Amino acid sequence: MFYVKVMPALQKACEELQNQWSAKSGKWPVPETPLVAVETRRSERWPHPYLGLLPGVAAYSSTLEDYCHLYNPYIDALTRCDLGQTHRRVATQPVLSDQLCQQLKKLFSCPRNTSVKAKLEFEAAVRTHQALDNSQVFLELKTFVLNLSAFLNKRYSDRSSHIELFQKQLIMHTFFFLVSIKAPELCEKFCNIFKLYFNIDTMDQATLDIFKQKASVFLIPRRHGKTWIVVAIISILLASVQDLRIGYVAHQKHVANAVFTEVINTLHTFFPGKYMDVKKENGTIIFGLPNKKPSTLLCATCFNKNSIRGQTFQLLFVDEANFIKKDALPTILGFMLQKDAKIIFISSSNSSDQSTSFLYNLKGASERMLNVVSYVCSNHKEDFSMQDGLISCPCYSLHVPSYISIDEQIKTTTNLFLDGVFDTELMGDSSCGTLSTFQIISESALSQFELCRIDTASPQVQAHLNSTVHMYIDPAFTNNLDASGTGISVIGRLGAKTKVILGCEHFFLQKLTGTAALQIASCATSLLRSVVIIHPMIKCAQITIEGNSSQDSAVAIANFIDECAPIPVTFYHQSDKTKGVLCPLYLLGQEKAVAFESFIYAMNLGLCKASQLIVSHTIKLSFDPVTYLLEQVRAIKCQSLRDGSHTYHAKQKNLSDDLLVSVVMSLYLSSANTLPFKPLHIERFF
């Protein structure tokens, strides 16, 4: 019975002794006089609070810095905090031999005469260091790190023996911004100290500044512990840092309610309920320790954006930000104007839908806000899509969290329910059609194409110019200038392999009057007539009219051109699969990818040239037709499809690729000798 009565007192006394031992163990005592005193000019020496006055160059000594961190660490192995012990792993400290210790003591056995100025300078350094160590802000920030460390060390969950790298990065983005607003004058000193706590002491200042930015974005695959770590961070912030205002916004009400409840349960586990004021009607938690200003958490959803208006959050966590209601984004982004506020966007990435993967557009931004967890690098995305048994990038050392199951069977089973869902939910930044990120045509080839043009009017060149040219027409039957236009190009053969662009048009209908076929045919005929006038050796033209948009209009265009052409013309004829009837049109299919590859090959080898006398009636006189074409050539992108095939296009926001398609297809079809080019059959059937 006596043992039972005194047990609580014994435990309390034991904890006090452990705290005292923890506070003193491994710490150097501050000497009354400097151990070392270099009597040089004040500008050439450096006062160290534990060693004395050292040469100024010692401030840049990494050896001295490592020595001090090893033998006088800021945090020892069994540091106590409100939530238990941190269990920090401490490096083994080398021990000096007895003989060496005796010799070193002899060096300092002689009395040293230290000047009064040196003593005053040393004492000032000691006071500054002690004031920094005991400042309220430093103790709060230190308490947060220690409490979070103890909390995540199997106090939060049995599985939380360690955290993932992205979770540590999320903690650092939160913490170092907090340092920058809580102690702006001492921010650099505090950051240098706390870098040791996170084991990033070798990180340079430019990289560390990224953590202090006012916005950060995390794209993490599903089921990896995003909300889990956010709840831990918010809970420990409320318990450790006073006068802090935190906001949490979720895409659904049940998610916000779950986080709200989990934070309450976490705080109740370690602290009495009297420290906490919960207001369920507006999702607010107010937590305050005795004699400290309370901190506040507000949990809201994107559907109730008015609840976050007028708030002064210093940290705003936006969970599943890709799926946030777009009407709420302006309200959320309004906190960027607040000087001491940071927005942290956290989301999984359903990259099969552009509307729910808009945050990935931040990739490549100079602010370096985007953080992505992916199992496949950009160079191997196509391999990942084409090989069913591949679950991660071959150039990665696969690290899978202990609570995640990823293998070939999981991938196969998941894709059975919905094709491609494993890729889009796991890879984070992939899409159902992946665009190549490298330049397809070299810059030197583009410069050569623009500058080195052929004088096709000279007799020497005309002697080698083939008498037959090829024209390709990609018609568009719309007056929407932003959507699409008609692309027309004329290409001639120079010698055995070289192709020369003699003329090109990018024609847009001004009005829809029912005469689109006639207007397109007139544009093509005018182009052909001008090319023939400049190059009188051209005697025949092979014409291909694309009929994917309207087969009837394509046939009409062929009839108009046949009646008005200045030279004999033949047309590509497509066979009707059911009746076998030949029609003067061309249906563009999967050969488009092959045609683009042929064009890319010709451009990179310099086998595709432009004429100095290139003809164009529709491209503005102030705009060089070759430069106009090059804008589309530079925008060529290779898109990988799910079936393993790929296609090419050069569509841009303010410019269509009609002219480029006509040039590509004209070059491709002019290279074949067995295509069905025939005169137009004009015999009447009635």
Curated annotation (Swiss-Prot):
EC number(s) stated in the UniProt entry for this protein: 3.1.-.-
Keywords: DNA-binding, Host nucleus, Hydrolase, Viral genome packaging, Viral release from host cell
Catalytic residues (UniProt): 320, 474, 546, 658
Cross-referenced Gene3D superfamilies: 3.30.420.320, P-loop containing nucleotide triphosphate hydrolases (3.40.50.300)
Motif Walker A motif per record, residues: 220-227
Record localization: Host nucleus
Enzyme class, spelled out: hydrolase
Motif (Walker B motif): 315-320
GO CC, alphabetical: host cell nucleus
GO biological-process terms attached to the record: chromosome organization
Self-association and partners: Interacts with the terminase subunits TRM1 and TRM2. Interacts with portal protein.
Protein name in the entry: Tripartite terminase subunit 3
